[in-house]
Design a protein with these regions (language model features):
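N-terminal Sec-pathway targeting helices
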Residues: 1-14
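Mature extracytoplasmic/periplasmic domains
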Residues: 269-329
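Extracytoplasmic ligand-binding site segments that recognize negatively charged/polar headgroups
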Residues: 84, 89-212, 217-229
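Periplasmic-binding protein-like
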Residues: 202-208, 246-270
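A ligand-binding cleft/hinge motif common to bilobed small-molecule-binding domains
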Residues: 94-97, 226-227, 232-249
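Conserved C-terminal helix/tail region of periplasmic/extracytoplasmic solute-binding proteins
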Residues: 325-357
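Early extracytoplasmic/lumenal segment of secretory-pathway proteins
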Residues: 9, 22-97
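Ligand-binding "clamshell"
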Residues: 99-106, 128-132, 243-254, 316-319
Length: 357
């Protein structure tokens, strides 16, 4: 937004500044004030901006795009009320939680066009069994990015990361479910385990990984790997795709014993005001051409099979990011384990981080 430098006349200053403040407050809170406005609550840079302009041109709706940086921040804002979002894009475990707390609108499927374009493998998931509340937007995995300049033999299993060859050379994503889940999968247990014995074994196994861990970070992983500053990293497939595109020595794989299959889905929050605009946007994003353009821009895998067929061959045939059924069958979606078990996962992860120090 351009900054207005000066005004002519004191009264005009006050009037214009009040107007700017009103518009800014509307954008910051996500509150829809116009019948032709659609307020989208999404992750930053998680849609091709040219698609938003195309949507506005085709439908006449004005898009107000508001961002969040975590599922928890998004959930809190919607649960508190007082703000209105017509569309949101939460992850699967948060959708489960929001459904249970009656925070989402049950979709009228008669108003949907293009739902049949969604890959049958990615519907009827445990967090929304009948897809009554959500439509898949992007999907992906958690796996290992490795650098062939440092790694003698490509990893095949989670336990390969425990090798002394990786001493002080592994980056871990800063997430309790991801890191504890990795340790659970390494011992062939479910990453949704609520068995305290198995969780303690996973924690003890993680402690043995400590000499190999260079850092536990979030977005910084990308630059470390692109700049050849680490041999391997545990991260999300979408982030990995960006790394691989920037450095020819980087590769991504999902361990055969299992990992996380994640989803970000489109939902309509219960506080939505413009249902017509919300359905128009969902249907717009279900169109194969639009979904393909979005997937190519963002770099994440599209669940839209017709859109996938429109992607360049080098993208749709890349098994690193569009794995086959043999890989997918061993993946698990994170379940909403409830606050008590989530607290245990967080505590174990915090203990691991403190143990490293």
């Amino acid at each position: 937004m351009k900054r207005l430098v000066y005004f002519m006349g004191g009264v005009l200053v006050i009037i214009v500044m009040l107007g700017i403040l009103s518009v800014k407050l509307s954008a910051d809170t996500g509150k829809s004030t116009l019948k032709n406005q659609l307020t989208i609550y999404n992750w930053g840079d998680y849609i091709d901006d040219s698609l938003l302009k195309k949507f506005e041109k085709e439908t006449g709706y004005k898009v107000n795009y508001v961002t969040f940086d975590s599922n928890e921040a998004m959930y809190t804002k919607i649960k508190q009320g007082g703000t209105t979002y017509d569309i949101a894009i939460p992850s699967e475990y948060m959708i489960d939680k929001m459904i249970s707390e009656n925070l989402l609108v049950k979709l009228d499927k008669k108003k949907l066009t293009g739902f049949d374009n969604i890959d049958k493998r990615f519907i009827h998931q445990s967090f929304d069994p009948e897809n009554d509340y959500s439509i898949p937007y992007f999907w992906g995995t958690v796996g290992i990015v490795y650098n062939d300049k440092f790694v003698k033999q490509a990893p095949q299993h989670w336990d390969d990361l425990w090798s002394s060859d990786y001493r002080d050379n592994i980056m871990l994503v800063d997430g309790a479910r991801e890191v504890i889940g990795m340790a659970l999968n390494a011992q062939h247990d479910s990453l949704n385990s609520t068995d305290m014995g198995k969780l303690n074994l996973a924690y003890n196994h993680l402690k043995e990984l400590t000499p190999n861990v260079k850092a536990i970070v979030a977005d910084e992983i990308k630059q470390y790997m692109i700049n050849n500053e680490a041999a391997a990293a545990v991260t999300f497939s979408g982030e990995a795709a960006e790394m691989v595109a920037e450095n020819k020595h980087l590769h991504y794989m999902v361990p055969s014993e299992g990992s996380n299959l994640w989803f970000d889905n489109i939902v309509i929050p219960k506080t939505a005001k413009n249902y017509a605009a919300a359905y128009a946007f969902i249907n717009f994003m279900l169109e194969p051409k639009n979904a393909a353009q979005n997937a190519e821009y963002v770099g994440y895998a599209t669940p839209n099979v017709k859109a996938e067929s429109l992607l360049p061959a080098k993208i749709r045939n890349d098994k690193q990011f569009y794995p086959d059924n043999q890989v997918i069958k061993n993946l698990e979606v994170y379940k909403n384990l409830g606050p008590d078990w989530l607290g245990i996962y967080n505590d174990l992860f915090l203990q691991f981080k403190m143990y490293r120090k």
